Regions:
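Carbohydrate-active catalytic/glycan-binding domains of CAZyme proteins
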Residues: 1-106
Length: 106
């Protein structure tokens, strides 16, 4: 669910792992979202029943100051292969400064 009326949530990716559903997405504010403090960030939520969700945006990860993804992390895409799961995402400037991936530990 939205935290406030000015928040935008986009690019959801739903996956199931054992008895939990995970929803990965990007979110942003309505003001100064291209390069500022309201820029895109990646978050996730989990649920047992697809109705009640626990949102955990602050746990996923954050860019290091002055890194290629320090100001923006957007448009997550999830890939599972073997027993590993990876998230690919765009960095600053909607991916202009690069894109990356991280292993998800669920």
């Amino acid at each position: 669910p939205q935290r406030n009326k000015k928040e935008a949530i986009t690019r959801p990716y739903l996956m199931r792992r054992k008895d939990l559903y995970y929803l990965f997405y990007c979110f942003r504010g309505s003001d100064d979202f291209r390069d500022g403090t309201d820029s895109y960030k990646i978050g996730y939520a989990y649920s047992k029943n697809l109705t009640e969700w626990n949102r955990k945006d602050n746990i996923i990860f954050a860019g290091v100051k002055e890194n290629w993804d320090a100001n923006m992390m957007a448009y997550p895409s999830i890939l599972s292969t073997g027993n590993k799961t990876y998230m690919f995402y765009n960095g600053n400037g909607f991916g202009k400064s690069g894109f990356g991936f991280a292993e998800l530990i669920l």
